[in-house]
Amino acid sequence: MTGNLRTFILMAALTALVMGMGGLIGGRGGAVIALAIAGAGNLFAWWNSDKMVLRQQGAHLVTRQQAPELVDMVAALAQRANLPMPKVYVLETEQPNAFATGRNPENAAVAVTQGIMRVLNRDELAGVIAHELAHIKHRDTLTMTVTATMAGAIAMLGNMLMFSSMFGGRDDNRGSGLAAILAMIFAPMAAGLVQMAISRTREYEADRMGAEICGRPMALAGALAKISRAAGQVVNIPAERNPASASMFIVNPLHALRMDRLFATHPPTEERIARLQAMASGAPASGPWGAR
């Protein structure tokens, strides 16, 4: 199953959960209203999420005059990826990490930390930036915004269902009391699992395309190894304050976080590196980035 097909199926599952929760609360009309509420939330998040996350992370915009090597690298890789030049931001944290945001390729941004520019060499940093550009090209920033909003809507509907059950609910509600209780408990959990599964799928796809953009799969593999080792040793305070943003980063930024794979926002780093190593045996047609 391709990554895009898997994402489509998981998104369909989230939509079904939203409508199912709405249906338990208010029948067919409730399902439609729940979907409309989720749609309105998605529209708001689509327009504002990039500004919100950049502000939460304390990112500041940099120009070519301030960071010529970084901005030139982003420009060269964006050209290889056939993308408009994104805005470039720097985060004032020593944890090596990076993320992309923006509602579409024309309004996108790439953010890197101070730490990543110190820890990685030139080719490794190019691999990370190429990974983030792959997210932009795939419109993963939009996908993850939608999934986060829908997961939040399901949690809200779960609370509404709890109060509806407590105070009697509708007489013609086709869901039994037991079904309502089970949905109230398990639907938000299922939504979270689906959200995390989508996040992991998009990371694999971004690794693959990022390696194609930069032309150096082993450079990206080396970057992932270095970032993963350092992420558990250096605290990223803005990310710790906003843990919902963890899935945006190339490696989970939360300090000393060990979770079951089912609940992980990112695939195991070892598996990501193994896939990149398998790619390294075939040279991209475009050749490696930065080759002279």
Swiss-Prot record:
Record carries keyword Transmembrane: yes
EC number(s) from the headed UniProt entry: 3.4.24.-
GO molecular function: metalloendopeptidase activity; zinc ion binding
Top-tier EC class: hydrolase
Catalytic residues, chain numbering: 132
Binding-site list for Zn(2+): 131, 135, 203
Subcellular location: Cell inner membrane
Top-level taxon in the UniProt lineage: Bacteria
NCBIfam families: PRK01345.1, PRK03001.1
Protein name, as recorded: Protease HtpX homolog
Organism: Paracoccus denitrificans (strain Pd 1222)
